[in-house]
Amino acid sequence: MGHQNIWYSHPRKYGKGSRSCKICGNKHGLIRKYSMNICRQCFREYAKDIGFIKYR
């Protein structure tokens, strides 16, 4: 059994490892509110298209 076979063999059904950004697939900095599941970088890029308005 090589290193690659062992490295990601554990099932990811819950926790941080199971979730990723819908747009880019990134696992860090996820915004999960309202079940968006978008990373913060993609959120800044697509916020206006989604319907969020920046007041300041």
Swiss-Prot record:
Residues engaged in binding Zn(2+): C21, C24, C39, C42
A UniProt-annotated Pfam family: Ribosomal_S14
One GO biological process term: cytoplasmic translation
Record's cofactor remark: Binds 1 zinc ion per subunit.
GO MF, one example: zinc ion binding
Keywords recorded for this protein, A-Z: Metal-binding, Ribonucleoprotein, Ribosomal protein, Zinc
InterPro entries: Ribosomal_uS14, RIbosomal_uS14_euk_arc, Ribosomal_uS14_sf
Cofactor: Zn(2+)
A GO cellular-component term linked to this record: cytosolic small ribosomal subunit
Coiled-coil ranges from the UniProt annotation: none
Family: Belongs to the universal ribosomal protein uS14 family.
Protein's recorded name: Small ribosomal subunit protein uS14
Lineage: Eukaryota, Rhodophyta, Florideophyceae, Rhodymeniophycidae, Ceramiales
